[in-house]
Swiss-Prot record:
Record-given protein name: Growth hormone-regulated TBC protein 6
Stretches that traverse the bilayer: none
UniProt-listed Pfam families: RabGAP-TBC (PF00566)
Top-level division of the source organism's lineage: Eukaryota
Gene transcribed to yield this protein: tbc-6
Annotated Rab-GAP TBC domain residues: 78-256
Annotated GO MF terms: GTPase activator activity
């Protein structure tokens, strides 16, 4: 899986000879990447560059922060890297304000965190240093300390890594991590009740927006938690290209959970023919895994626009969640 990123900076300032991008991830033209990935990236890059340069000019010219509806539209069309930290932290409280209490962290949780530190984006230029890994460990410890019902769950290490790389401020990055995980804490913990509930919700949405996929799921008797549970646990990190993840998170942080469902449904719709043609569980799992490297996943601007057009809102999600809670066992 490629996790390359792209930032809207002037063409002349891009170092094409560098093997890593601004977040420290390997570029597709690195010798360690496959040539097919490089060609796919270059085609996307040439179409995406004018979009992000244009969006940055619009952000600098119009200042969308002055109007919530205008800001929503601008966020959906992409937050320039220079403004991303500011927008992500816009509504994030500080731990210094006493919003979260501290709890004792079990030794077993600390052990699990330590085991996953070197496994977190091991090829990333910045996260593989000892100092940054310690920072990552402190961030994950803070989640366990402030949200004991979560403790630590595999996948949160990747979420924390992305936040640290983007925010580039340990204290505020930890604030944001704890804040975002607290909003989705039922995805984690022993019974993962929130994840099971939202897989039920996603199934209902797929039945409405791409019923052919649901027919295949039911024919093969496969649950969405096995297929795409990781999407929701990791908020699509390690499942989609990094620029796509960042664009999704822009919307997720500003608008809420509806964007997890919007993206999931849009990805299934874009790959509906291949998925609905599957005749076995193994074939289905392969097709779902291939979604992350599909053209639909790479062309993030088009994916966001298609997702925004879906009739999925936080209000409709809450209604479906209420129904799902009655249907799933405790």
């Amino acid at each position: 899986m490629y996790v390359f990123n792209f930032y809207p900076i002037p063409r002349k300032s891009i170092n094409f000879r560098s093997d890593v991008d601004d977040l420290g991830f390997l570029r597709p033209w690195s010798p360690q990447e496959e040539s097919g990935c490089k060609k796919q990236y270059e085609a996307w890059y040439s179409s995406y560059l004018p979009i992000v340069v244009r969006r940055r000019c619009r952000w600098e010219k119009e200042n969308p922060r002055r109007n919530s509806h205008l800001l929503q539209r601008f966020v959906r069309k992409g937050i320039p890297h220079t403004f991303r930290k500011e927008l992500w932290l816009r509504s994030c409280p500080s731990r210094a304000d006493g919003v979260w209490q501290r709890h004792e962290v079990p030794d077993e949780v600390i052990k699990q965190i330590k085991l996953d530190l070197p496994r977190t984006f091991p090829d990333n230029k910045f996260l593989k240093t000892e100092g940054t890994r310690k920072t990552l460990g402190r961030a994950l410890f803070a989640v366990a300390e402030h949200i004991p019902s979560v403790g630590y769950c595999q996948g949160l290490n990747f979420v924390a890594g992305v936040i640290l790389l983007v925010v580039n401020d340990e204290s505020r990055a930890i604030d944001l991590l704890v804040h975002l995980v607290s909003q989705r804490q039922e995805y984690y913990g022993k019974n993962m009740i929130g994840l099971r509930r939202d897989m039920h919700v996603l199934h209902s949405l797929l039945r409405e927006h791409c019923p052919r996929v649901v027919v295949t799921l039911e024919k093969l008797d496969v649950g969405l938690d096995m297929l795409v549970g990781k999407w929701f646990v990791c908020w699509f990190v390690e499942s989609l290209p990094m620029e796509t993840v960042l664009r999704l998170w822009d919307c997720l942080i500003y608008e809420g959970d509806e964007w997890l469902f919007r993206i999931a449904v849009a990805l299934f719709r874009s790959n509906m023919i291949a998925i609905s043609s599957c005749e076995s569980i193994d074939q289905l799992m392969t097709e779902v895994q291939n979604i992350g490297t599909s053209k639909a996943a790479l062309y993030c601007h088009q994916l966001i626009l298609k997702s925004a057009a879906l009739s999925i809102t936080n209000k409709s999600i809450e209604a479906l969640r209420a129904d799902a809670e009655l249907a799933i066992p405790e």
